[in-house]
From Swiss-Prot:
Cofactor: binding details: Binds 2 manganese ions per subunit.
Alphabetized UniProt keyword annotations: Aminopeptidase, Cytoplasm, Hydrolase, Manganese, Metal-binding, Protease
Gene3D superfamilies: Leucine Aminopeptidase, subunit E, domain 1, Zn peptidases
Gene name, Swiss-Prot/TrEMBL: pepA
Record's protein name: Probable cytosol aminopeptidase
Record's catalysed reaction(s): Release of an N-terminal amino acid, Xaa-|-Yaa-, in which Xaa is preferably Leu, but may be other amino acids including Pro although not Arg or Lys, and Yaa may be Pro. Amino acid amides and methyl esters are also readily hydrolyzed, but rates on arylamides are exceedingly low; Release of an N-terminal amino acid, preferentially leucine, but not glutamic or aspartic acids
């Protein structure tokens, strides 16, 4: 898909399809008013007849509009004027995509980016439009022998901005929106890939692929022998039941003006399949446990977006690849594991494995002397119960970092909600036989999981994103979401802008 921006008048658009908005009740947007004057009241006459009310998401396709050089005019309902939210805006963009896809149009000139969206600028209108279009057009059919038949997709979208002074911001939105959308799609592709293909070795190859594609990326892959030498016993215990060995992939992106600047480290839990191990999961929906590597997928997608945006930062992405399977050699409830930093953990449930992989990985990244560390993990069902599928759960030992992430989440419309940490939750992790237990009981399960991780982050500023409820969708719309690539990308954009 080709995207571009311009500042032009609606009456001069010679294109396959011209898209303008109509507010509720039957109120023309500025661009639609210009078209109405040009067509001598043709559009307002149709509205008076009741052909379109203007409710958000309604569409009306017109052909041969008098005096209008465009082949088609698509009217899109935008709801009540001045009340358009980010969510509604993305929905009307997606309705535009659906309507245009059913025509033979190869090009679209879109004036919806001129609409007033609450609290947003032209930059955000253009960027959100690109992200919404790419979301609408995404499909994952790699393993279908007969590909679904689709109409020929339009190839080019031109976004109009009302003020010439906003063109520079719109161009920036164009480049960043394309990069972030690419990163989201990469994350989705990896997460949607079946676990008989996407195993820890596959994740490692993807990480190497980024290094082959970008000159300022270097990838190092650590195998189980190296992990054993480092004392990553908790990580390795989780992997013991699988015939697919674990791999820790370290993707180093260096583009800071000061090559010695401390890096931002992104850690992704990469359980390419989680059966639960000896504490085996119910069979219902176990297939969705291929998505237990959503954290690693989001780190991979973010590193892709980062490289495309060429942000002047030093960033390290870590993919903690592993499988959790039942086997005669699998770790057991009751085992006590000595972690890389020396703390011992009693295993009370082998299905609480992600935190064991992460605790050693979080210790490993100390060697980079990071500015900060953020880990992403589909960690707990408890977070899904608490926050549903809309907000990722955020925990942090730093108010500054937590606020920066929440700000980025709001900006990118990739929402997160902060949950507490504290010594009262640490009490729930007490064990009679080890320094820590790997679970803290039924109450506050998302928080006690984050609290456990905090024991391994004492040497740097740290935040944890529990994306168990946001990394994928179930049911008819089943598939990976690519979250929180947008949040992380915005966080990095903000870091680059403020240094």
């Amino acid at each position: 898909m080709e995207f571009s921006v311009k500042n032009g008048s609606v009456e001069k658009q010679r294109t396959a399809c011209l898209v303008v908005g109509v507010y509720e009740p039957r109120r023309l947007s500025a661009a639609a008013e210009q078209l109405d004057k040009l067509s001598e009241g043709y559009i307002s006459t149709l509205l008076r007849r009741g052909d379109l009310e203007g409710k958000a998401g309604q569409t009306l396709l017109l052909h041969n509009v008098p005096n209008v050089p465009a082949d088609r005019v698509l009217l899109v309902g935008c709801g009540k004027e001045r009340e358009l939210t980010e969510r509604q805006y993305k929905q009307i963009i997606q309705k535009m995509v659906q309507a245009v896809s059913e025509t033979g149009s190869m090009e679209v000139v879109c004036f919806l980016t001129e609409l007033h969206v609450k609290g947003r600028t032209s930059y955000w209108n253009v960027r959100f439009a690109i992200e919404a279009i790419q979301e609408s057009l995404y499909s994952y059919n790699d393993f279908k022998s007969i590909k679904p038949e689709v109409r020929r997709e339009f190839r080019r979208v031109i976004f109009n901005v009302a003020n010439r002074k906003d063109l520079a911001d719109a161009e920036r939105a164009l480049e960043q929106g394309k990069a972030i959308s690419t990163g989201v799609a990469f994350a989705k592709n990896v997460a949607n890939c079946p676990p008989n293909v996407c195993n820890p070795a596959y994740l490692a190859e993807l990480a190497k692929g980024l290094a082959a594609e970008y000159d300022n990326i270097r990838t190092t892959v650590i195998d189980e022998a190296e992990m054993a030498a480092l004392g990553m016993n908790a990580y390795l215990a989780v992997s013991r039941g699988s015939q697919n060995p674990a791999y820790l992939s370290v993707i180093e992106y260096k583009n800071h003006p000061n090559p010695d600047a401390k890096p931002i480290v992104l850690v992704g839990k990469g359980l390419t399949f989680d059966s639960g191990g000896i504490s085996i999961k119910p069979s219902d929906s176990m297939d969705e446990m291929k998505y237990d590597m959503g954290g690693a997928a989001s780190v991979y997608g973010t590193m892709k977006a980062l490289a495309e945006m060429k942000l002047p930062l030093n960033v390290i992405g870590v993919l903690a690849g592993c499988e959790n399977m039942p086997d005669g050699n699998a770790y057991r409830p009751g085992d006590i594991l000595t972690t890389m930093n020396g703390l011992t953990v009693e295993v009370l449930n082998t299905d609480a494995e992600g935190r064991l992989v992460l605790c050693d990985t979080l210790t490993y990244v100390e060697r980079f002397e990071p500015e900060l560390v953020i880990d992403m993990a589909t960690l707990t069902g408890a977070c899904m119960i608490a926050l549903g599928a809309h907000n990722s759960g955020l925990m942090s030992t730093s108010n500054v970092l937590a606020n920066d992430l929440l700000n980025a989440a709001e900006q990118a419309d990739d929402k997160a909600w902060r949950l507490p940490l504290g010594e009262e939750y640490q009490e729930q992790l007490k064990s009679n036989f080890a320094d820590l237990a790997n679970i803290g009981g039924r109450l506050g399960g998302a928080i006690t999981a984050g609290q456990l991780l905090s024991n391994f982050t004492k040497k740097y500023v740290w935040a944890h994103l529990d994306i168990a409820g946001t990394a994928w969708k179930s049911g008819v719309a089943k598939g990976a979401t690519g979250r929180p690539v947008s949040l992380l990308s915005q966080f990095l954009i903000n870091k680059a802008n403020n240094q």
